[in-house]
């Protein structure tokens, strides 16, 4: 979806948010495993893991935002690499909030005890989408979608 040139950056971001929430429910064990693998103290694994697991995604997010800047969709003053990193951190935090106990508790404390239930997914997606649109997209473009 990130490489789909028929979609606007706003549409791609919304699709990615939906995927983050859906995959957190469907692949909870994998999300937890990723969290465990990325937070252990094994130095060799720490240096290999981000490169092997994150490079593919990082390159696509940066490309998506840079192309969006060229098309006038993404704020031109942003560093696309730092913006991609920040956007991915939001996606990652959402995934952990649904799959990992500590992050779920934080999610609930900031919101309410049932925020991680499926009935609230649209609210979570919509609100997070508004935050990302405001941070990343040119105002006229973010109002379009």
Residue ranges of predicted features:
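Secondary-structure edge/capping motif, primarily at the C-terminal ends of alpha-helices
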Residues: 1-5, 31-38, 98-105
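Gram-positive cell-envelope targeting signals
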Residues: 13, 31-34, 46, 85, ...
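Short alpha-helical transmembrane interface motifs in multi-pass membrane proteins
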Residues: 14, 47-51, 126-127
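Short secondary-structure transition hinges
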Residues: 21, 25-62, 73, 82-84, ...
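C-terminal peripheral helix-coil segments that are non-catalytic and often amphipathic
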Residues: 22, 55, 59, 63-71, ...
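Short, hydrophobic secondary-structure boundary micro-motifs
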Residues: 32-34, 47, 77, 107, ...
């Amino acid at each position: 979806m990130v490489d789909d040139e028929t979609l606007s950056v706003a549409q791609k971001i919304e699709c990615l948010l939906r995927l983050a929430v859906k995959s957190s429910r469907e692949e909870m064990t994998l999300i937890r495993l990723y969290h465990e693998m990325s937070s252990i103290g094994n130095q060799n694994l720490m240096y290999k893991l981000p490169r092997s697991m994150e490079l593919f995604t990082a390159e696509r997010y940066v490309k998506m935002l840079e192309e969006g800047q060229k098309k006038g969709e993404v704020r031109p003053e942003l560093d696309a690499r730092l913006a991609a990193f920040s956007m991915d951190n939001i996606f990652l935090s959402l995934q952990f909030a649904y799959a990992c106990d500590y992050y779920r508790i934080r999610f609930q404390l900031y919101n309410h005890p049932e925020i991680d239930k499926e009935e609230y997914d649209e609210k979570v997606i919509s609100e997070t989408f508004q935050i990302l649109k405001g941070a990343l997209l040119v105002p006229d473009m973010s109002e379009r979608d």
